[in-house]
């Protein structure tokens, strides 16, 4: 495999799609040595097929606001790869949404889902719509219009969306309700549903919980205990909340959260009351974290900066893609944390990730660390299919086992001759080989 040649061809085909090209290059660099041991892959043009989505659906989403004004947004669904199961991946409603971001997320999702060992392919979708400042009725009308087109290409055995940034329990409810009205059927065609109508226990916390199970295992493998360690978290949304909750439960001290307006430094650490307040911050819809410092005066709000300047043992980017850049990496390396783990999808820029790996720091990629969310979605799909509901303890036990299995796969494929574990390479190779073998078995399709 000639990575540069492949990337040049992709750049010509997809100019300006920076996030997608970044994600593809990271995987290709990781798997090239293994790929080159399989001439049958080259003959079948496996790489050329695996980097392109099977299908991309784009549609307009017209809706009317509370003043009677008509708006038109763009809706997308990227059905990336179905080799190991129906397409599975979230919906994101945010002004930054574009095809490049959704293709990167769908590509990553393909390998992340493979790591869980559950039968799920990769997909992603969403719209450039923002829920910020919109009333419940406006959000409902938008979701209903969005589903009027999306329902044609999804279903429990075809494509199962879930939530993501801007798509929480409220939005999933509106989307599910419209799907049910249009199709005259109740099915497990979405995950992240409410407990009263087919949802799974601990699904809201699952991404954060799974991330901490992975980090805990990573630390233990290298002779460290998470108990008593300080944790810097970015974001204050669903993922950050779950991560803070589980980190505190495991005995660590979470000392930061952040938002677009800056970050909160709380040296005393987040307790149950403060973690629950994160839900109030999110529910306010204002997308700022500063009110935390008003509510808890012992904490400090630092405007316009990221939390990576704070000395910590564990750094967990939990907000969005490429939030931790090369300069942030330099700052973290100076403060010498034990590990950095991407809880957000591709939370570190390529430059930052390269610096962590070059310094032999414990660094784990999002496709492994945050797989707990989609793993629990897979468990929700199973519960819907067998018409049963498992308890918190049953779901948590299964999630724990899945995350430990993902860690073992990363170690198996990522251990270097000098003993260093390259978790990025390990995760990419493990996920890639499962998808590649499935594609080879199914012929040129």
Q: Where in the sequence are the language-model features?
A:
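Conserved active-site and cofactor/substrate-binding residues in soluble primary-metabolism enzymes
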Residues: 1, 15, 19-22, 26, ...
């Amino acid at each position: 495999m000639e990575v540069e040649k492949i990337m040049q061809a992709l750049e010509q085909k997809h100019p300006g799609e920076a996030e997608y090209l970044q994600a593809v290059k990271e995987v290709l660099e990781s798997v090239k040595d293994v790929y080159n041991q399989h001439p049958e892959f080259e003959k079948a043009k496996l790489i050329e097929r695996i980097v392109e989505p099977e299908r991309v659906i784009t549609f307009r989403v017209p809706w009317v606001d509370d003043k009677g004004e008509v708006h038109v947004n763009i809706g997308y669904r990227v059905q990336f790869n179905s080799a190991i199961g129906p397409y599975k991946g979230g919906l994101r409603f945010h002004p930054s949404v574009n095809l490049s971001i959704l293709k990167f997320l769908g590509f990553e999702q393909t390998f992340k889902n493979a790591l869980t060992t559950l039968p799920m392919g990769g997909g992603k979708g969403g719209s450039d719509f923002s829920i910020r400042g919109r009333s419940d009725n406006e959000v409902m009308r938008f979701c209903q219009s969005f589903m009027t087109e999306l329902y044609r290409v999804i279903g429990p055995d075809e494509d199962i969306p879930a939530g993501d940034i801007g798509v929480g329990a409220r939005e999933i409810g509106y989307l599910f309700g419209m799907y049910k009205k249009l199709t005259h059927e109740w099915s497990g065609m979405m995950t992240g549903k409410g407990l009263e109508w087919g949802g799974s226990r601990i699904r809201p916390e699952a991404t954060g919980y799974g991330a901490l199970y992975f980090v805990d295992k990573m630390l233990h493998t290298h002779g460290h205990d998470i108990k008593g360690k300080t944790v810097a978290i970015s974001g204050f949304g669903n993922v950050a909340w779950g991560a803070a909750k589980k980190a505190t439960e495991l005995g660590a001290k979470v000392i930061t959260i952040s938002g677009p307006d800056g970050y909160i430094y709380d040296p005393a650490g987040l307790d149950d009351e403060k973690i629950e307040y994160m839900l109030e911050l999110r529910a306010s819809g204002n997308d700022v974290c500063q009110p935390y410092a008003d509510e808890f005066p012992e904490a400090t709000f630092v405007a316009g900066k990221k939390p990576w300047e704070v000395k910590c043992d564990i750094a967990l980017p939990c907000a969005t893609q490429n939030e931790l850049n090369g300069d942030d990496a330099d700052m973290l390396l100076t403060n010498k944390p034990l590990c950095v783990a991407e809880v957000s999808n591709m939370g570190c820029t390529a430059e930052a990730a390269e610096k962590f790996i070059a310094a032999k720091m414990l660094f784990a990629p999002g496709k492994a660390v945050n797989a707990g969310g989609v793993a629990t979605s897979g468990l929700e799909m199973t519960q819907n299919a067998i018409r049963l509901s498992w308890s918190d303890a049953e779901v948590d036990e299964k999630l724990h086992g899945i995350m430990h299995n993902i860690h073992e796969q990363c170690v198996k494929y990522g251990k270097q001759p000098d003993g260093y574990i390259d978790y990025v390479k390990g995760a990419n190779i493990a996920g890639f080989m499962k998808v590649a073998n499935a594609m080879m078995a199914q012929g040129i399709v």
